[in-house]
């Protein structure tokens, strides 16, 4: 039996190095011109980088704004607040928090208040089931593996 209370969030989070985020000052037009096919349904919104998270925007809100010709709206105006958990919190506690708050994504911080990643409801359920949930829109199956691969490539280049 898998004990979710024994697994810390830091073991299952999506690392900050592979988080796709948007700047709060960008307009809907700028975002959609630069990223014409956003694959994530929920996107963190920041003010000058990941250490200053201001909220989360849902992809469908961006597309709705586009459909309503609201191209000049700033992403920060569309963002909703996002809850933060600690990387030492258990996946079990965070799963309970997802259910209680009716949310699907939380930012994760370390003991110093630095953003270390994010965790989704899907991450918690995958941990419970012990398998990756992959749907037709996933271009990357495992974001933790992607972060590790990127780190290895960068390290290899610096050693050359």
Which ranges hold each PLM region?
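Cytosolic regulatory modules rich in charged/polar residues
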Residues: 1-160
């Amino acid at each position: 039996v898998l004990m979710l209370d024994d697994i810390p969030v830091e073991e299952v989070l999506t690392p900050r190095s592979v988080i796709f985020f948007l700047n709060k000052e960008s307009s809907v037009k700028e975002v959609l011109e630069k990223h014409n096919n956003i694959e994530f349904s929920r996107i963190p919104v920041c003010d000058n980088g990941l250490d200053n998270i201001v909220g989360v925007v849902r992809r469908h809100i961006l597309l709705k704004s586009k459909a309503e010709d609201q191209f000049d709206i700033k992403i920060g105006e569309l963002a909703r607040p996002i809850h933060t958990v600690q990387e030492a919190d258990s996946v079990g506690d965070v799963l309970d928090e997802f259910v209680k708050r009716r949310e699907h994504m939380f930012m994760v911080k370390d003991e110093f208040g630095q953003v270390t990643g994010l965790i989704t409801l899907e991450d918690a359920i995958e941990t419970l089931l012990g398998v990756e949930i992959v749907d037709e829109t996933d271009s990357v199956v495992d974001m933790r593996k992607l972060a590790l691969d990127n780190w290895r490539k960068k390290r290899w280049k610096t050693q050359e």
